[in-house]
């Protein structure tokens, strides 16, 4: 009678088990939730929804409305409403797209740029968590996060 060998978990060079994708999902979800909660609280202090804050931060360069909608993972009418509410507050402006006057490009006003920087600076929970990492850990983490993002949205 032949018995099948019991499969062994893969191990890293230092003999620790290599985490499976499932092992990584919960800690990753916790980080994402922390970022979302932090952004939501800071946005509310400035009278913005989380989606408006995300849009304001994303507009570090002028962006076609369709690209902003894709970035926010929403439909064009939702992005138009978000931008319209921020435009009313003087945070964003819409201008005709070069070469296609039917399309619009959204960009931040100076007030919008200042608020976007303020929101980022006030996201203390995220900053504190990242500052707790060593320089080497942050240096190692950045390319891994970029690779994950590229895999998800390539």
Where in the sequence are the language-model features?
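N-terminal leader segment of winged-helix/HTH proteins
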Residues: 1-46, 110, 132, 147
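Pre-recognition alpha-helix immediately N-terminal to the DNA-recognition helix
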Residues: 27, 34, 38, 54-57, ...
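Short, locally clustered residues in the helix-turn-helix/winged-helix DNA-binding domain
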Residues: 32, 57-61, 146
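N-terminal helix-turn-helix DNA-binding core of bacterial DNA-binding proteins
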Residues: 37-78
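DNA-binding alpha-helical recognition surfaces that contact promoter or target DNA
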Residues: 57, 81, 143
């Amino acid at each position: 009678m032949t018995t099948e060998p019991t499969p062994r978990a893969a191990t890293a060079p230092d003999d620790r088990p290599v985490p499976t994708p499932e092992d990584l999902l919960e800690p990753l979800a916790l980080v994402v939730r922390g970022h979302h909660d932090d952004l939501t609280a800071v946005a509310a202090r400035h009278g913005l929804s989380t989606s408006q804050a995300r849009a304001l931060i994303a507009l570090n360069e002028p962006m076609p409305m369709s690209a902003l909608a894709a970035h926010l993972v929403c439909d064009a009418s939702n992005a138009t409403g978000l931008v319209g509410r921020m435009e009313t507050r003087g945070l964003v402006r819409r201008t005709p797209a070069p070469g296609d006057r039917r399309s619009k490009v959204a960009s931040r006003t100076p007030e919008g740029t200042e608020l976007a920087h303020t929101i980022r600076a006030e996201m203390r929970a995220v900053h504190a968590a990242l500052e707790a990492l060593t320089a080497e850990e942050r240096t190692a983490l950045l390319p891994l996060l970029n690779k994950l993002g590229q895999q998800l949205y390539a």
